[in-house]
Every structure is written in C-alpha cells, then in structure tokens.
Curated annotation (Swiss-Prot):
Keyword NAD included in the entry's annotation: yes
Signal peptide: none
Identification of the protein by name: L-aspartate dehydrogenase
Pfam families from the UniProt entry: Asp_DH_C, NAD_binding_3
Active-site residues, Swiss-Prot/TrEMBL: 232
Metabolic or biological pathway, per its Swiss-Prot or TrEMBL entry: Cofactor biosynthesis; NAD(+) biosynthesis; iminoaspartate from L-aspartate (dehydrogenase route): step 1/1
Residues the record lists as binding NAD(+): 134, 202
Record key words, sorted: NAD, NADP, Oxidoreductase, Pyridine nucleotide biosynthesis
GO molecular function: aspartate dehydrogenase activity; NAD binding; NADP binding; oxidoreductase activity, acting on the CH-NH2 group of donors, NAD or NADP as acceptor
UniProt EC number: 1.4.1.21
Gene: nadX
UniProt source species: Bradyrhizobium diazoefficiens (strain JCM 10833 / BCRC 13528 / IAM 13628 / NBRC 14792 / USDA 110)
Substrates-to-products reaction catalysed: L-aspartate + NADP(+) + H2O = oxaloacetate + NH4(+) + NADPH + H(+); L-aspartate + NAD(+) + H2O = oxaloacetate + NH4(+) + NADH + H(+)
Gene Ontology biological-process entries: NAD biosynthetic process
Length: 280
C-alpha cells in the first residue's frame, strides 16, 4: 500500500480495542479473520451455538479467542458485534449495552422490534451502531436528514435463492422456484418489509433509520431470476439535494447476505481506532 494512503487506516498504538462476535456464519468468520490481523483491534471472545463445529476455525487463528455464552460477551470486550439471526438480537445486545459497551448490529431489521434497547443503551452509557452494510450513500442520507427529506424510495431485486424461506413468501404461499421473469413480491414500508423479509432487508431498515424512519420509507421487493446479485436502487428527494444510488452486491456464502456487509463491519471497527477518519 502507498504510504501516503496508509495514514487513512493507521491505528493508534496506545491500547487494543477488544471485540467480541456473536455468531460465526459467513459474516462473523470474515470479521473474526480480519480482527485476528490486529491493527489496533483484538478478537477477545466469540459466542456460537455449537463450539465444536467452529473449533478448527478458531484454532487456526493466531490468537484464538475465548468462547463464551452470549450474555457474557460484554464482560470480555469493548465492542460486541451481532452476527446472529435477528431472533437473537436482544439476547446479544441487551447485556452489552447494560454494561456500557458498544454493540454493532448487523441484523438491523430486528432492532425495530427491540427499539427500547436504544433507551437502555442511553441510560447506561452504551452505544448501538448500525454499519453501512450494503447501502452506499448512507452518509448522504445522514446529512440530508439534518434538513428536510421529502421522500425515500428503495427497489430491491434479489436472485431466487436469496429469498427462499422468507416469511412473507411462505405465509402467502408464493411459488418463486419456477419464475422465468421478475415478480414484484412486496410494496410497502420498511417496517413491513423487515417483518416479511427479516433476513433480506436489513439494508432497507438501515436506510430508514438514517433518514425519515421505517414508516415513511417506501420499499419494493422483486424476485428476479435474471439477476445473480442483490440489486438495490434508492432515490431520495430532500431540500438539500436529489440523489439516487444503485449497487449490485456479490452474495456471500449465505445467498441472503451480500459480501460487502462483512467488509463494512470490518471498516467500521477499524475506524474506531483510526487516526484519520473519512466520512460522516
């Protein structure tokens, strides 16, 4: 790396920031491997449902972390990263913020049903951090909401495999396996989308929390057999600017999640120790 640019990610050397991870799926393992490289951060602990399943991976790290119950991660870390199913969000985040620690929430859709955790964090000096994830332009939305945002619209197209098992599809008995052309599955608010597609629409909830809220953010979801990537297009009308964003995310090993999600969390964690921070 050119030394002129390395300053942008240089970490302070005073003390390492301890990070714990709840869940070692496709996102959690990538974050764990990156933390094992150091750079002012250390992987201090993990929580997994089946420790034996992940033992080989953990033993292969330079500094294998402790394996702890999820409610004890906050004792061993400064930041707890939630990389588990959204049903586990409260069990992971609540003990951490009660201890005044920071919690990075990947399953941000689950935060809408547990929003009292924000008040709990405030009362105890903790923090809840939502990473940018798959949503480019989140800085622009954060800035625009300081003024007035008139409307936020998002259209998501996903490959068939990335939508299988979504509650909305199951409850409405929609057959997507035989699709030959795009099908609009859903149109409504970000809050409704999060309930119907909890593993697919974290990006919509993050967009809504950065902007006008989950009840004023409009979302369309398409099952599209013609695409191989998760495609998001966002349009924002504000008094400060009118802008649109489009991104095609390469799926990770979990087809419901884009590869960039893990990279976004890694960037966020490194930013906590960076001497020079770029972005809002």
């Amino acid at each position: 790396m050119d030394r002129r640019w390395k300053v942008m990610t240089d970490q302070t050397a005073s003390s390492e920031l301890r990070v714990a991870i709840a869940g070692l799926g496709s996102i959690g393992t990538k974050i764990a491997a990156a933390l094992d490289q150091g750079e002012g951060l250390t992987l201090s602990a993990v929580a997994v449902r089946d420790p034996a399943k992940h033992q080989a991976f953990l033993n292969g790290l330079r500094r294998p972390p402790q394996v702890l119950p999820i409610d004890q991660l906050g004792e061993a870390a400064d930041i707890v990263v939630e990389c588990a199913p959204s049903s586990q969000l409260r069990a992971i985040v609540e003990p951490a913020v009660k201890r005044g620690k920071a919690a990075v929430v990947v399953s941000v859709g689950g935060l809408l049903d547990n929003f009292d955790l924000v008040d709990l964090a405030r009362a105890n000096g903790g923090r809840i951090i939502v990473p940018t994830g798959a949503l480019i332009g989140l800085d622009a939305v954060n800035a625009a909401v300081i003024g007035t945002i008139h409307s936020v619209k998002m259209v998501t197209r996903k490959p068939i495999d990335g939508l299988k098992g979504a509650p909305f599809i199951v409850h409405n008995n929609i057959d997507i396996d035989t699709l030959r052309e795009p099908l609009k599955l859903f149109e409504g608010t970000a809050r409704e989308a999060a309930k119907g597609f909890p593993a697919n629409l974290n990006v919509a909830v993050a967009l809504s929390l950065a902007g006008v809220g989950p009840d004023r953010t409009s979302v369309q979801i398409w099952a599209d057999p013609t695409v191989t990537r998760n495609v998001h297009r966002i349009e924002v009308e504000a008094d400060s600017a009118r802008f649109s964003m489009s991104i095609e995310n390469i799926p990770s090993e979990n087809p419901k999640t884009g590869l960039i999600t893990a990279l976004s969390v890694i960037a966020l964690l490194r930013k906590q120790r960076a001497t020079l921070c770029v972005g809002t």
